[in-house]
Amino acid sequence: MATVIPGDLSEVRDTQKVPSGKRKRGETKPRKNFPCQLCDKAFNSVEKLKVHSYSHTGERPYKCIQQDCTKAFVSKYKLQRHMATHSPEKTHKCNYCEKMFHRKDHLKNHLHTHDPNKETFKCEECGKNYNTKLGFKRHLALHAATSGDLTCKVCLQTFESTGVLLEHLKSHAGKSSGGVKEKKHQCEHCDRRFYTRKDVRRHMVVHTGRKDFLCQYCAQRFGRKDHLTRHMKKSHNQELLKVKTEPVDFLDPFTCNVSVPIKDELLPVMSLPSSELLSKPFTNTLQLNLYNTPFQSMQSSGSAHQMITTLPLGMTCPIDMDTVHPSHHLSFKYPFSSTSYAISIPEKEQPLKGEIESYLMELQGGVPSSSQDSQASSSSKLGLDPQIGSLDDGAGDLSLSKSSISISDPLNTPALDFSQLFNFIPLNGPPYNPLSVGSLGMSYSQEEAHSSVSQLPPQTQDLQDPANTIGLGSLHSLSAAFTSSLSTSTTLPRFHQAFQ
């Protein structure tokens, strides 16, 4: 059996004790058994002594791995704390002003500005406010130094320079001269000394002339970040407030269900060239449909009509009538009738050629027979006069819109060849609806209508322009095909002359 010496029992018990997280009141702090050989400081661990030794050698083994960052640190903890500044996420938020910070100590220093018990000191000469009395007295001393007065405003002592006066003001701020830090970091290019290495690096821009901080509003450059921040608050305060108030997701100008006048909706579209309109990707609520009617009639079972605003190039955005403001409702000059041809909106990602084909298939399916054509033509002759009279009233309102002309001109290029798409257009189209013309309106008189009904040409040749593959020439032939097929029906007289 093993024997245990009573004298060693206490040592065994001490080694078996589980170390507690908190020290008791009677216990003293751990001894600093690791003194520095170069100074009088001592530390309680080898790691802290090693970190301290870097202050004597100038070594900084922990370097930042970012490409444009040249900072290095004496400990791994300080490097990790610095790496948070390269992250776009700021996790520490102020509860008073919602300002975000990368580090917790920066937030803690910022919270002192929101202390309600702290009085502010306002300068009567320039109106600036200061949170600390020391900063306020320094500011007053600067005003006195600029005027040539180097006397202390508290004890009326005179000094030889402004720097000595500012050092003296610290004694009146409740700080003893012994507690003042030593400026042990000296600049390599001048005699100035600073408290920290950070202040030295910030001062170096005076000698290097580097200006790495660019203002995003006026392209002015600065050597220090605090100078850029001061410039932004002073010169671009309105821009900063505008950025804070804007939402994250900007509204698309073509977003539907917005009660905006149609004229206002057309402005952002009309300001764009046609090449940008063709290359711009459309949202799911905006379809490219060259043959959409401006108004889509619903079923007659009491359902409300859905208004479709006709944009240039046939871009349509359905707007519910309930969501439109009463002041924005359109006054329809021509009522809905059986000639309102309802066209189904194509799928979201259907190409342009597929849209035209599906539309033409619907036209072929909805065209009446030849016998019904003759009956429709005879009945349309009877009701032609009142229709012409109603159109004559709006002759001044209906004209070729400038928007359609300005958009069709850039499309007259050889690159946009849609001639193959129009080869299979049927000769028999739906009856003419004055509302389906959209923005392409024409004006004519009543006397011209009777003469043109009886003397319509069978077909008109295309405009022989090699550069204009599509444009007014193809639209001219397309309109002639419809007018020749409908003969004396309710088509608009001299429809082809509007595109000559």
UniProtKB/Swiss-Prot annotation:
Changing T339A: No effect on transcription activation capacity. Residues 41-242 are annotated as: Decreased nuclear import with localization in the nucleus but also in the cytoplasm. Residues 1-30, 365-388 are annotated as: Disordered. It is found in: Nucleus. Gene3D superfamilies: Classic Zinc Finger (3.30.160.60). A motif (Nuclear localization signal) lies at residues 22-25. Residual nuclear import after mutation of the nuclear localization signal is assigned to zinc finger domains of PLAG1. When cultured cells transformed by PLAG1 overexpression are injected in nude mouse, rapidly growing tumors (fibrosarcomaS) are observed at the site of inoculation. This is Zinc finger protein PLAG1. It comes from Homo sapiens (Human). The gene is PLAG1.
